[in-house]
Amino acid sequence: MKRLWTVFAITLLALTAAGPVLAQGDPFTGTWKLDVAKSKYDPGPAPQSQMRTWDASGQVTIEGVNAAGKPAKYGYTLKDDGKDYPTMGAIPNGAQTVAVKRLSPNKIEANFTRDGKHAETATFSVSKDGKVLNILAKGTSPTDGKPFTNMTVWEKQ
């Protein structure tokens, strides 16, 4: 009987310690605001503002004002299962699908395709404190085929 209580106590202790870790969930989930001043768009131009909402299922919606001052809304599904998922709305890179792999708990890589060809690779990294999301995106423009590199900084809301 004493052994049973010992096993029970150890199990309870382990579950209690794991609770906060399990409750934290995916570090990408939440609402993120683009810090335009800290972000770099090469060749540009940068959007005027953006908010990124990332839900627990991996659905990402981006809303804001583009460089021309017009409202913009688009999205995609970022599930780290390596499968292609369709994009939604007028995504700036012109991609129709995206596939994701997780590199670490706080880092994923997304590969976007346009007309069946690679359009962009984006690496998403959440800081250890969970307050900052950095996205490094490298690809080719859908309008002129020239390369672009964007390093964007997002603050958790």
Describe every region a protein language model picked out.
Residues 10-11, 21:
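Cleavable N-terminal signal peptides
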Residues 9-10, 40:
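Enrichment for repetitive, rod-forming helical segments
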Residues 21-157:
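Hydrophobic small-molecule pocket/channel-lining residues, especially in calycin-type beta-barrels
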Residues 1-9:
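Bacterial N-terminal signal peptides that target proteins for export
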